[in-house]
Amino acid sequence: MNKRREKGQSHSTRPPHPQPPQWLVFTPEEIELLIAELAKKGYGPSMIGIILRDQYGIPLVKPILGKGVSEVLREKGLHPPLPEDLLMLIRKAVNLRRHLDEHPKDYHAKKGLIDLESKIRRLVKYYKRRGVLPPDWKYDPEAAKLLVST
C-alpha cells in the first residue's frame, strides 16, 4: 500500500562511461577547490553536484576524483552535521508543523506529517546502524525547529 511512493523521480541521464570525459578542462585539484568554495557559500552536496554539472560542465565528480562530493567535503571538514536527505525531511516536517499551527483542521496535512515523521524515524534508525548518527540521537520536533533555523 505504498501510495506515497508511486510517482517517479525526475533526474538527469547519467553519463554512460565511468571514466572522466576527454573534453574536461579542470584538474582534480581545481574541482576539489570548487567543491570547497561552493560548500563555504552554504550549498549542500547535491546542490554542489548540480552546479558543477550545469555551470562548470563537470558531469560526475566520482570518476574524476575517485570519490564523491560528500567524501571531499568530509576530508576538508566542511560536511554538514546531518546527512542532507535527513535534513531536508526535517525541514519539510518543520514547515508542515507551522502550516498545521495555522490550519489545525487540515487532516490531510496531519496524515502527511505522520507519514513524514515516520520516514524520518526510519532514516534515523538506518543512519544509527551505519554509524553516521550517534546512538543517542533522537528526532524531536521542538529541537528540529532550532536545527533547521540555524
Swiss-Prot record:
One biological process term in Gene Ontology: translation
Protein keywords: Ribonucleoprotein, Ribosomal protein
Residues covered by region (Disordered): 1-22
Listed GO MF terms: small ribosomal subunit rRNA binding; structural constituent of ribosome
SMART domains: Ribosomal_S13_N, Ribosomal_S15
InterPro entries per UniProt: Ribosomal_uS15 (IPR000589), Ribosomal_uS15_arc_euk (IPR023029), Ribosomal_uS15_N (IPR012606), uS15_NS1_RNA-bd_sf (IPR009068)
CDD domains documented for this protein: Ribosomal_S15p_S13e (cd00353)
The UniProt record lists the keyword Ribonucleoprotein: yes
Entries under PROSITE patterns matching the protein: RIBOSOMAL_S15
One cellular-component annotation, GO: cytosolic small ribosomal subunit
The keyword Hydrolase belongs to this UniProt entry's keyword annotation: no
HAMAP family tied to this protein: Ribosomal_uS15_A
The protein's assembly and partners: Part of the 30S ribosomal subunit.
Family in the record: Belongs to the universal ribosomal protein uS15 family.
PANTHER family: RIBOSOMAL PROTEIN S15P/S13E (PTHR11885), SMALL RIBOSOMAL SUBUNIT PROTEIN US15 (PTHR11885:SF6)
NCBIfam families: PRK08561.1
Name of protein: Small ribosomal subunit protein uS15
Organism, as annotated: Aeropyrum pernix (strain ATCC 700893 / DSM 11879 / JCM 9820 / NBRC 100138 / K1)
Gene expressing this chain: rps15
